[in-house]
Structure formats: C-alpha cells, structure tokens
Amino acid sequence: MRVIAAAGAPAADNEYSVHTTLWGRSFERGPRHAGDALPEEIYSLTTSSTRAPDAAAHLEISFESGLPVAINGVPMTLTELIESVTTIAGNHGVGRVTDDVSGTVCEAPAAVVLHAAHAALGVEAMHALDATVRVELFRGSHRVVSAHHS
C-alpha cells in the first residue's frame, strides 16, 4: 500500500492504495476513509471542475477500423493518443469517476472520452468503418458533438 499524506495531516490518517497505468490512476480508500472526500492534492491527472478553464476544448478523434489513430488531424500511436487525451481532458476536469459502494476513485480522462467517442460510432459500425468523432470538454463534463463515418 502506498501512503499519500495531505499537507499537514499525519500519514496514518491518509492511507490509500494507489494503482497507476497508462489509462489512469485509481485510489482505494480504507474503511475508515469510506465516504470521505479525497483531498484535491491526491489528484495528478485531473483538475477540479471548479478550477478548469472557462473555455471548452474540442477534440476531433479519428478512427480507423474502430481504433483511434489521430487527434485533431495529428496521427499518433495508441499510447501517444491516450497520453494526449489524458492531458487535454484532465486539464478540463474530465475523467474523475467515483464508486461509492467500493470506495474506489479513478482518474481516467482518456478512458472516459474515448469510451464516449466509441459509443457514438455505434456498436455494429465501429470495427468496420473509419470515422471521426468530435468531443467537447468543459469544466468536468464531456459530450459528443458529432460523429461522421467515412
């Protein structure tokens, strides 16, 4: 278990299990922390929606055979694309997910955005067609603006 201590608080009061992958980070709170809000300092991939920029960001995600291959017309490897979407969406407060039952909190900006974009393609078409999906990110929320099949 990794220990994360908030400024001025004893480490024993701030124990969380932290798991990090390319897709994001998850924090599991112990029983004595269940229901407590996590300190803002614990988040490294996402900005609080109240501190996110006032201007929305727009991502145009291009897919080939159902796989994301470019952002705003710039071709990228899958790893580069995930990292780019994580940075952009996270800066706009998108990607915090909380499971109140288990006490797990996740930061997964790219997963949230790419899931929404993939869903917009439609289940039957996503593996067969090339497409572009436009997503708007704004103060902790996201929405698919348009989806076009090639």
What residues fall within each predicted segment?
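Nucleotide-activated chemistry modules centered on ATP-dependent adenylation/adenylyltransferase
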Residues: M1-S150
